[in-house]
Regions:
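Active-site glycine/GP-rich loop and adjacent strand/helix microenvironment
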Residues: 9-25, 139-408
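Conserved AMP-binding loop of ANL adenylate-forming enzymes
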Residues: 107-143
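Short, composition-biased local secondary-structure segments
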Residues: 95-109, 125, 171-181
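Nucleotide 5′-phosphate-binding alpha/beta core
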Residues: 5, 9-108, 112-113, 252, ...
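Short secondary-structure boundary/capping elements
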Residues: 77, 97-101, 124-128, 146-150
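Acidic/glycine-enriched edge-of-secondary-structure segments
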Residues: 84-97, 133-142, 163-167
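Hydrophobic/aromatic beta-strand patches that form the interior of the parallel beta-sheet core
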Residues: 48, 54, 117-118, 144, ...
Length: 408
């Protein structure tokens, strides 16, 4: 069902245990998983016997055996789509109904068969666009596959087709609304939104309230699909019923007590074709005690609370320290120290790459253009470059310094 069933304690559900055992049996036939799955799993608590599988592990495994590192249980012909996400990581999906499970999030946000949905997630390379397209189809919504570019045209289309619902990152909707207002385009039919892929800053949330837009957030990844979703504002996020979610001490297998902040670890139970067991998201969150006031009885988490490592999300894209190193290595033979500064001004995320480099101004101008191009190529994001004196960057181990204020 789209509405969560009665679930009880997260580590005691018997139907989860049955699904987990089936998932593990499939995964044991895959060589790279078999070593992780030697211990017998008789309870959900026994999951801690299985080592956490990290995104960095997945990148290296796939690199050695493209495209999926031989981690798929079934042949590629049985899958529907292949995607390539930053990392790079290859993802895929199957033909099963609600494969990514985002229909639950849309349903909780009030979307239905009366809605015209402007889907502003990308439809190319990465799975986000298809994730929400699939979800909206299940709810019988009418979908405009907009993607995440050209805000002027987005505003025009939103007015002409009488869009009632938006899915995408929060900042982009604000830009579209402002474009519509500046061009006297009526968009009064827009009443609801479901956000993911980027933080909802307090000032932006207040802006949407002032426009009488009912908005909700959901939390998911390209590797895992839906992890959790809001069913009511300020009530945390309901964990999707087809996953097992654990909160552990970052970098370990050890669970933390409910209420303590730690790293989100996910096992996906409904997709046997590509077994995902104890996958470390690199995200921080915490389990909220008690039941949701909406009546949904699955456990809740506070939502996305930052990164367990220095990886950060900017304009819907993950940026990793290894990518910063690659930019520098591709252009500099002496591998100077570099630090990426992520800031926010005028409701927009900004990137500035600081590089310790001494040369004449003409060399710096030419090199600046090359670095900007390399940032766009590797990060899929625009940014600026600033060359600084040797030894001026602090010796704090930070490659990415996120200065944005995420609020409480």
């Amino acid at each position: 069902t789209l509405r969560s069933r009665g679930l009880g304690d997260v580590y005691k559900r018997q139907d989860h245990l049955v699904s987990l055992k089936k998932l593990i049996e499939n995964a044991k036939t895959i060589t790279l998983h078999s070593d992780r799955l030697k211990n017998e799993i008789s309870t959900l608590t026994d999951l801690q016997k299985i080592d956490v599988f990290r995104k960095s592990d997945l990148i290296e495994i796939q690199k050695k055996n493209l495209p999926f590192g031989n981690l798929n249980f079934t042949e590629l012909s049985e899958f529907s789509h292949i995607y390539r996400s930053p990392g790079p990581i290859y993802d895929l999906d199957g033909y099963g109904n609600n494969w990514w499970r985002f229909a639950r999030a849309l349903n909780a946000a009030g979307f239905n068969n009366k809605d015209i949905v402007q889907n502003c997630f990308s439809y190319h390379f990465t799975p986000a666009g298809m994730m929400f397209d699939e979800a909206a189809k299940i709810l019988k919504c009418t979908i405009f596959p907009a993607g995440g570019e050209n805000s002027d045209m987005q505003a025009e289309i939103m007015s002409e087709i009488n869009t009632t619902g938006y899915v995408g990152i929060p900042d982009f909707l604000k830009i579209i609304i402002e474009k519509a207002e500046n061009n006297d385009l009526p968009i009064s039919n827009l009443k609801k939104a479901l956000f993911s892929g980027g933080p909802l800053f307090p000032d932006v949330a207040e802006y949407f309230k002032s426009k009488n837009i009912n908005f909700y957030q959901c939390y998911g990844t390209a590797d895992l699909g839906l992890i959790a979703y809001e069913a009511d504002i300020n009530d945390g996020m309901i964990v999707d019923e087809d996953i097992i979610l654990e909160i552990v001490k970052p970098g370990t297998n050890e669970r933390v007590p409910n209420g303590e902040v730690g790293e989100v670890i996910v096992t996906v139970l409904n997709n046997y074709e590509l077994p995902i067991i104890r996958f470390a998201t690199g995200d921080l969150s915490t389990i909220i005690e008690g039941q949701s006031k909406t009546g949904r009885t699955n456990i809740r988490i506070k939502g996305w609370m930052g990164r367990a490592d220095q990886t950060t999300k900017v304009r819907g894209m993950f940026v990793q320290p290894s990518q910063i190193a690659k930019i520098v290595d591709n252009l500099f033979t002496n591998k100077p120290k570099a630090k990426l500064i992520v800031s926010r001004e005028n409701n927009r995320d900004n990137l500035k790459l600081l590089i310790e480099y001494v040369s004449n101004e003409n060399d710096k101008i030419a090199l600046n253009e090359k670095v900007v191009d390399e940032m766009k190529k590797i990060l899929n994001l625009n940014g600026i470059v600033e060359f600084v004196n040797l030894g001026s960057l602090p010796n704090d181990g930070k490659v990415i310094d996120d200065l944005r204020d995420f609020g409480d």
